[in-house]
Curated annotation (Swiss-Prot):
Subunit structure: The complex is composed of two ATP-binding proteins (TauB), two transmembrane proteins (TauC) and a solute-binding protein (TauA).
GO molecular function: ABC-type taurine transporter transporter activity; ATP binding; ATP hydrolysis activity
The name this protein goes by in its record: Taurine import ATP-binding protein TauB
Annotated binding of ATP, by residue: G41, P42, S43, G44, C45, G46, K47, T48
Localisation: Cell inner membrane
Its membrane topology: Peripheral membrane protein
Example of a GO cellular component annotation carried by this entry: plasma membrane
Taxonomic superkingdom: Bacteria
InterPro entries assigned to the protein according to its UniProt record, in alphabetical order: AAA+_ATPase (IPR003593), ABC_transporter-like_ATP-bd (IPR003439), ABC_transporter-like_CS (IPR017871), ABC_transporter_ATP-bind (IPR050166), P-loop_NTPase (IPR027417)
Keyword Cell inner membrane: yes
Higher taxonomy: Bacteria, Pseudomonadati, Pseudomonadota, Alphaproteobacteria, Candidatus Pelagibacterales
Annotated ABC transporter domain residues: 7-236
Class in the EC hierarchy, top level: translocase
Length: 265
């Protein structure tokens, strides 16, 4: 069964001035179980709106999106979200953040503690369970956010620019971690990013979205995510295929931005 299906998805907003904004128009796609999709595009192309509809935070104006045959009409435990900022409870310890969802469901404490230890090992935070979250760096906090999401075993992981606030070196390490988690869990993942390089490195599939109205402009099927699981991300970025695809997409988005600026003048 296909994991996620979007059919004729439309989202229309009204501005305070009464103007109509077509944030998404007739968005159609099918994402199969276990695929990693990255979504890229200029500001205003609707990529975050698409993610919020998939998360159940927004209801579309028309059309529908369904996970495993069930139409999404609100948040659900089968979907996990990782935000640009960790959205952690900074007054709690690392372990208390990670097991928060399981504690709310009143799961067995012994089994929960074991799961916490397993996920902290996977995300590279072994030994940090009792550390107050506010003492962690930005990169470490995002590792906590990943563990907190994954410990609940969602079918679909939604990531809204999760690495955007990190420095270059930490971001590279986290990109490798995302690929490692994808390989080890087989989870379906949608990751929103503003970085062309990141979209190419992490996306088994990549959608470039265009604005006004927000829509899928072009789809790419890419080899780089599979290469990056066991390979060197820096070396992958030097390959002719990566370089040429990056330049093609950069030019595409540049032209979109120029068109938007022209309309706004």
């Amino acid at each position: 069964m296909s994991d996620l299906i979007s059919q004729n998805l439309n989202m229309i907003f009204k501005t305070p001035k009464g103007e109509t904004v077509h944030a998404l128009k007739d968005v159609n796609f099918t994402l199969k179980k276990g695929e990693l999709l990255t979504v890229l595009g200029p500001s205003g192309c609707g990529k975050t709106t698409l993610l919020n509809i998939t998360a159940g935070f927004l209801r579309p104006t028309s059309g529908a999106i369904a996970l495993n045959g069930n139409e999404i009409d609100g948040p659900g435990v089968e979907r996990g979200m990782v935000f640009q900022q960790g959205a952690l409870f900074e007054w709690l310890t690392v372990a208390e953040n990670v097991d928060f969802g399981l504690r709310m469901k009143k799961e067995d404490p012994v089994k929960t503690a074991k799961k916490v230890e397993e996920w902290l090992n996977i995300v590279g935070l072994q030994g940090f369970g009792n550390t107050p979250t506010y003492q962690l760096s930005g990169g470490m906090q995002q590792r906590v956010a990943l563990a907190r999401c994954l410990i609940n075993d969602p079918d679909l992981i939604l990531m809204d620019e999760p690495l955007g606030a990190l420095d270059a070196l930490t971001r590279e390490k986290m990109q490798s971690l995302v690929l490692k988690i994808w390989k080890e869990t087989g989870k379906t993942i949608i990751l929103i990013t503003h970085s062309v390089e990141e979209a190419l490195l992490l996306g088994e599939r990549l959608y470039v979205m265009a604005p006004r109205p927000g829509r899928i402009h072009k789809e790419y099927n890419l080899p780089f995510a599979s290469m990056g699981i066991d390979g060197d991300l820096r070396e992958i970025k030097k390959t002719p295929n990566f370089v040429s695809t990056r330049e093609e997409i950069l030019t595409m988005i540049w032209n979109m931005e120029e068109e938007i600026m022209g309309k706004d003048i």
